[in-house]
C-alpha cells in the first residue's frame, strides 16, 4: 500500500513538473513589482519562473523594486530582451595626480548575454578603458578619449572627451577597467575622473561641461540583455519546448537556446499554453478595409466584405461594379468560355468512353485468341469433376503485380517472366507472363491448363487459374517462398543442416509426385525437365515439383512420343537426346541425377571437379567402379548409422541413370523403394542383371552434351514450332 501511495505522489509531482516546463506557472504568482510587469518565463518565487534556468528567478524587495541579481530591472520583453541598470566604473585623482577613488565593474549575467544594442563608452580627458568579456569565447576591446578643455563639442563621442564603440552580443561575463594616461593633473579642474560604462545605444547624450566634471552624478545606465530558453535549438527540442498554442519557435540570435513569438494575427505571452490570443483587427484599427467595406474578424486575420453593388479589387478596396454594358460583354465571354469548356469536356468523356470500349473489345479479342471460349466450353462440359480453373481479369493481374513493376519480378527465363502477385484477399501467388509465340498453340495451352488444374498432389505446385485478356496468356499458381532445392544445395540458401533424413524425405516426395504424374493423373504427364532448380521447398522443407513449361501429355493409347529434344544439360536422358523418343523413363533418368545431387552435394554438371568427369552421372559411376564411393558422398550426410541406407539410395540412383531406358525402373517402383527405405520396413529390390561392369562402362560412355553449364534449352511444345511456352513456376 505504501508503494502505491509513493507512486501516486511521484506521478502528481511529475505532472506538476511537466505542466511547469510547458509554461504553466501557478495562479498566485506575482505579476507586478512596483511599476514593472513580471511575465513568464520570469518570476519571483519557485513555481512561477521557467524551472530549467535560475536566471529567470527575479527578486522583488520590500520597496517593490525588481532586481536581476543586484541589477535593477527596468522592463522585460517577451521577444528575448531584459533591460537592467548597470553600475558605471570610474577612477579619480586629486590635483597632484594621486588616485583617490577606483571602481571597476565586474558582472556575471548568468545564462543571459549582452545585446548588440549596447555601447561601450568612456568619458574623460586623457582617458582610456578596457572591456573584457567571456562566453562561448573571450573578447577584449578598449576605447580612448583625449581632450584639454571643457569646450569639447557636445553630443559627439568620437574620441574628444567621449569615446563610444559597439559591443558584440553573446557574452555573459563583463569586466570594465578605467585608466588615465597622466592621472589628470592638467585637466583636474574640469575633469578629475575617468568614467567607463556600458549603456544602451541612444540612452547617453554627451554634455561636455557636466559629464567631464561628475557625469551629472549618474551612477547607473540602462543596458540591454538577451535571454533565451535552454541551450538547444528549435529543431532539437521539436514539440517538447515551452512555446504555447498559436505561437512559433525561433532560434535565439543572442546566443544558444530559442525564443517564442505569437503568430501573425495573435498577441500575448507565447510561453503560456493559451497565451497567444487572436487580435480583433476590426476593433483595434489594424485593418486596411476601405470606407465602403465591412471588417470581419477571423482567427489570426480579417476579411474586408464589400456591400451589394461593390466588388473587392487588388488593393483590398471596394469599388463599384462595372457598368451593365461591359458586364453584358463579360457575361457573353464567360458564357462562351463555359460552353466551350463543356464541349471539350464532352469530347474528352466521349474519347474516354471510346477508349474504354476499344480496351474492352481488345480484351475480348485476346480472350478469344487465347482460347477463352474453348476453356469455358471444356470446363462447362466436364460435368462433375475436379476441374477448378479460375479465370482472372487483366485488371486484377495488373493490380496484383503493381502494373508488372520490376520490383515484383521473381525470375526470368527463356519461356517468360514470373511475377509475385498479391490478390485482393491478400493471398500471394506467382503469375507467369509468357513470351509472345505462335497462336496455333492455343489448344495445347488450354489442354495443359485443364490437365494441370486437376492435379491435386501435395508435392506438385498447384495451378490456380489463368488470365486470357492479355496479349499473351498469364498463368496463376501457388507461391512458394523458401527457394529451390538447387539454392539449398549449391546456391544462396545453402544449408549445412540439410541432413540425410531431410534429403531422403525430399527424394521420396519428388519420386511420389512423378509417379502420380506418370501413373495416376487423368492423362499421363511427362515433366521433361526434372532438376533441383525446378523443385521448390516450403518453410517445412516439403518438396514441390514446378515448371511444367516443357511437359508433355501422353495419350492413353501411346507409351512414347517423338518430340524435339528439350531439357537441361546434365539431367537430359541420353537415349531421349539421341533418338528424340520421349517416355516416362526420361523423367526417371533426370530424377536419378537429382538423387545423386542429394547424395553428393555436387552439381549435375560442373567444370571445376578435380579428378572426376564433369558430368555427375559419370563421376558417380567412376567413383563406384574405383572403390571411391565414400569420397563422392557428401560428408555432412554420411555417418555410421546410415551407411547402408545411403548405399541403397546410391544403388537406386545408379539404376535410374542406366543408359538404356528399358533397363530403368518405373517411377512408382522408385517411389516405393525410397518410401520403404525411408520408413526402414520392407525394401523392394530390382534385378541385378544390369549391375555388372558393362553397365558402368555404358554410364562412363555418356558424352557431355554441351559446355554451357546449367543452361536450359527450351524450344516449346514439340508438336508445334515457334510457339509460346508457359512454365509453371513458383516464386524463386
UniProtKB/Swiss-Prot annotation:
- Please tell me in which tissues this protein is expressed: Predominantly expressed in green tissues such as stems and leaves. Detected at organ junctions.
Specify the EGF-like domain's residue ranges: 230-277, 278-319
Q: Name one GO molecular function term.
A: protein serine/threonine kinase activity
Query: Which superkingdom does the taxonomy of this entry point to?
Result: Eukaryota
Q: Which UniProt keywords apply?
A: ATP-binding, Calcium, Disulfide bond, EGF-like domain, Glycoprotein, Kinase, Membrane, Nucleotide-binding, Phosphoprotein, Repeat, Serine/threonine-protein kinase, Signal, Transferase, Transmembrane, Transmembrane helix
**What GO terms describe the biological role, i.e. biological process, of this protein?**
cell surface receptor signaling pathway; intracellular water homeostasis; oligosaccharide metabolic process; response to salicylic acid; unidimensional cell growth
Keyword Glycoprotein recorded: yes
Uppermost EC category: transferase
**GO cellular component terms listed in the entry, alphabetical order:** membrane; nucleus
List, alphabetically, the Gene3D superfamilies matched. Laminin (2.10.25.10), Phosphorylase Kinase, domain 1 (3.30.200.20), Transferase(Phosphotransferase) domain 1 (1.10.510.10)
Q: Which residues lie on this side of the membrane: Cytoplasmic?
A: 351-732
> What is this protein's name?
Wall-associated receptor kinase 2
Organism encoding this protein: Arabidopsis thaliana (Mouse-ear cress)
Q: Which gene encodes it?
A: WAK2
